[in-house]
A protein has these predicted regions:
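Gly/Ser-rich catalytic serine loop of serine hydrolases
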Residues: 48-57
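Extracellular glycan-interaction surfaces
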Residues: 63
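Beta-lactam-recognizing serine transpeptidase/beta-lactamase-like catalytic domain environment
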Residues: 18-43, 68-232
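Extracytoplasmic/periplasmic proteins that interact with beta-lactams or build/remodel peptidoglycan
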Residues: 1-19, 40
Length: 232
């Protein structure tokens, strides 16, 4: 039933390369993998296609910012229509501006400029290591599925950290990888994805620590705001 529902959902965008992956957060069970016929022409894009994750990646940026004490959900942050950081000029959609608002509101309204600013204050490698805590960059060997999660660079250069903060530049993720990110937020730790219950998934690069529960709780509240008062 989940597979049928997922396929019907992506087929409403049949003229595009639409994809969906559904993972049960509590167990890691892959419940559905669906994509349109246009996506099928290019292979298993839902599982192995790598794309800039865009604003969905702000979950990672918000988390790393909170982990390193840069922000809290209630922090007052700038959301100008445009911002120049180093050599990079970052724009919000249609250059909308909210002025100074809480991080939660900036997250709910998807302020690129806010998260570029937060990310610019990170050290090289911090965004990458937090992405790994969500499963991005992990290597899974799943019986019955070939998958790629994505890749986030070390970002030694400021411009790479700025662009990475709102899911652009060199950040790449698959729909499968972003399904893991959402499942991690729901479960509090990254579930090990499985397709066949009796077949164990092999995981490489498992040294990423679990995100602390208070930070996950704060992230969930911000994600809820996207639905109740934001862009969802």
């Amino acid at each position: 039933k989940v597979q049928d529902a997922a396929q019907k959902a992506v087929d409403t965008r049949a003229d595009t390369e639409a994809m969906m992956v559904v993972i049960r957060p509590s167990t890691g069970e892959v419940l559905a993998v669906a994509q349109t016929a246009n996506a099928d022409k290019k292979g298993d894009l839902a599982l192995t296609g790598l794309f800039p994750p865009g604003s969905t990646f702000k979950m990672v940026t918000a988390t790393v910012g909170m982990q390193h004490g840069l922000v809290t959900p209630d922090s007052t942050v700038p959301c100008p229509g445009t911002i120049k950081i180093g050599s990079r000029v970052v724009h919000n959609y249609n250059d909308f501006s909210l002025g100074n608002v809480s991080l939660t509101k900036a997250f709910a309204q998807s302020c690129n400029t806010t998260f570029a600013d937060v990310s610019s204050k990170l050290k090289p490698g911090e965004l990458k290591s937090t992405a790994q805590q969500f499963g991005i960059g992990q290597d899974y060997k799943i019986d019955g599925l070939d998958t790629l999660t994505g890749q986030v660079p070390q970002a030694d250069e400021l411009v790479d950290r700025v662009e990475g903060g709102f899911g652009q530049g060199k950040d790449l993720a698959s729909p499968f990888g972003m399904a893991l990110v959402a499942a991690t937020a729901a479960a509090g730790k990254t579930p090990t994805p499985t397709l066949i219950e009796s077949h164990k998934t092999t995981v490489k690069n498992t040294d990423a620590p679990t995100i602390d529960p208070p930070t996950i709780d704060k992230l969930r509240g911000m994600m809820r705001a996207v639905v109740t008062s934001g862009t969802a």
